[in-house]
């Protein structure tokens, strides 16, 4: 059974939700004055001029922790629509979801063994 008509509303929503921000950026680009001055190149911190160098280096553990978070956050984005249409899709989709979750568990075990989840 081909389910394309069920997803037409979804694709229209995706196109419109992609078009609106692009139009907003285009209109602001056309209407905003272009000024390249020293004020535009400064960093803004709550209306106060920054003291010292505004650029700092973060430790690598912040990046690895954020990367693991993003991976598992995207996992929930993929699993939510599957859970909402669980009864319609049948056993084949259930097995596919189990394989997907199993691959993610392997990734979690790998990150755990590499100590990517430890803060110290």
Curated annotation (Swiss-Prot):
Q: What is its EC number?
A: 7.1.1.-
PANTHER family cross-referenced by the UniProt entry: NADH-UBIQUINONE OXIDOREDUCTASE CHAIN 3
Taxonomic path? Eukaryota, Viridiplantae, Streptophyta, Embryophyta, Tracheophyta
Q: Which reaction does it catalyse?
A: a plastoquinone + NADH + (n+1) H(+)(in) = a plastoquinol + NAD(+) + n H(+)(out); a plastoquinone + NADPH + (n+1) H(+)(in) = a plastoquinol + NADP(+) + n H(+)(out)
GO CC aspect terms: chloroplast thylakoid membrane; NADH dehydrogenase complex
| Membrane topology term | Multi-pass membrane protein
Protein name per its UniProtKB record: NAD(P)H-quinone oxidoreductase subunit 3, chloroplastic
Keyword Cytoplasm in annotation: no
What is the species listed in this Swiss-Prot or TrEMBL entry? Psilotum nudum
* Role noted for this protein: NDH shuttles electrons from NAD(P)H:plastoquinone, via FMN and iron-sulfur (Fe-S) centers, to quinones in the photosynthetic chain and possibly in a chloroplast respiratory chain. The immediate electron acceptor for the enzyme in this species is believed to be plastoquinone. Couples the redox reaction to proton translocation, and thus conserves the redox energy in a proton gradient.
Keyword Magnesium in the entry? The reply is no
Record keywords, A-Z:
Chloroplast, Membrane, NAD, NADP, Plastid, Plastoquinone, Quinone, Thylakoid, Translocase, Transmembrane, Transmembrane helix, Transport
GO aspect biological process, one term:
photosynthesis, light reaction
Sequence similarity: Belongs to the complex I subunit 3 family.
HAMAP family linked? NDH1_NuoA
Q: How does it assemble?
A: NDH is composed of at least 16 different subunits, 5 of which are encoded in the nucleus.
* Localization annotation: Plastid, Chloroplast thylakoid membrane
In its UniProt record, a GO molecular function of this protein is:
quinone binding
Transmembrane residue ranges: 7-27, 64-84, 89-109
Which InterPro entries does UniProt cross-reference here?
Answer: NAD(P)H_OxRDtase_bac/plastid, NADH_UbQ/plastoQ_OxRdtase_su3, NDAH_ubi_oxred_su3_sf
